[in-house]
Amino acid sequence: LWGSAVLFLLNLIVVNFFNAWLSIFVSFLVILWLYAKEAMKEEDRHTTFKNFYFYLIAGGLGLSLLFMFVRTPLFPSIQFSAEVSPSLLATVNIGFKTLSQNTANLFVGSGPGTFAYDYSLFKDPAINQTVVWGVRFGQGYSFISTVLSTLGFLGILSLLALVGISLITIFRNVARHESKHTLVSGLVAGCAFLLLGWFIYPENFTLSLLAFIVLGILMSILHRDDAPVWGIRDHSLSFRTPWMMFGFSLVTVFLIALSVAGIYVEAKRYIAASRFQNAVTVLQQTGNVDNAIQGIGSSASLDPVNDQYQRFLAQAYLLKTQSIISASLQKVPSPEIQADFRNAVNSAVGAMQAAIQLNKIESFNWRTAGSIYETLIPLVPGADQSAINAYTEASSLDPSNPTSYVDLGRTHMIISDTAQGLLNQRNATAEQVKQYSAIRTSS
């Protein structure tokens, strides 16, 4: 145990993360309060043992306070990836702008896991002057501040009520009763550490799971009557009637079936993610578009509600379309090449439309649609306006991203060049000349 503690301390010193030191400082404050409360109630015995723990707590407080203000890397040779997130003020501003969109957002927010879309819609344009201008953050400064956008006032009030009631219950029970057991002190300090993390660090599965587990164990221990911490209490549950036995069996079978179904669905999602990653790797390393299409298509079939797979599938078909166009420039297109071109275009458009149907507020889906139609401008009538509409929709969903406006400007240039090329052709019809003259003027 002591070896694990020393190793943990060394890791903290090497990483030197401010939020971790702050959480540890608060945890040691809680332990110091528990120690002082018990020391004032008991007679002065085991002085040496108690002094050792007092000095240990004081050392932990001093060390964590020291490293909270030491921001210089202690080991410059060890490189860590930068951990970047929006500031607290920026996250709160995005939250209030999201709530002001409509009445539903005011009470329940934009929905779980949608902060990335809120960030794209309401981020400060000044972020474009920084190196992270192209990064779309999936979470804000912390879990609690992110909830303001995703779950609204009802969500954040519920979480704050959970934290407040839990802390009041814990400290009221600890203050009224003796907490001689080391387990109770450790759980109280750990609970303070994890709940504070909700306010100063983005949410992740591990921290959330640990927070609820520690909170549940601590509540269970504190609400026991006079049983010792590691005591065993007998509880019995009996079903004396056939109907109760039948109902219990039915619930058990339902839960087992639900568990099996959940495992099956998660296994499919895992396989889909694995095949998708392999397909992208193959495309990057070998440039084999057909194999990539097969792999991404398999992922889209296994996880049909994931718009990312459909978007990447559309992009893969777009690469195939572009390769067919490049090959047709070298010679007169044969009927086979024309058929391949039509199939690739139809597949790209179909996958792109599927991605948009799955997630209409994803700007990347609309940008993919714009890039497909942009490629088809010289070849397919009406593709020009479709490209403009798609890029315009993308810019409305991510108004502070300059890339969408660059895409839109490039599209107008292609339209203008296409119109000029058609005007230069001797066999251009009067209707085509009139149509593309108007397009060129507007572009």
Predicted regions and their residues:
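Transmembrane alpha-helices of multi-pass inner-membrane enzymes
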Residues: 1, 22-35, 159-163, 169, ...
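Membrane-interface alpha helices of multi-pass inner-membrane proteins
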Residues: 3-16, 193-199
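A membrane-periplasm/extracellular boundary helix in multi-pass inner-membrane enzymes
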Residues: 9-24, 28-104, 112, 117-121, ...
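Membrane-interfacial entry segments at the cytosolic side of transmembrane helices
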Residues: 40-59, 179-184, 232-254
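Interfacial juxtamembrane loops and adjacent helix segments
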Residues: 83-85, 93-108, 112-149, 328-339
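Amphipathic alpha-helical repeat scaffolds of TPR domains
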Residues: 264-285, 297, 301-336, 358-378, ...
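Canonical positions in the second alpha-helix
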Residues: 299, 354-355, 393-394
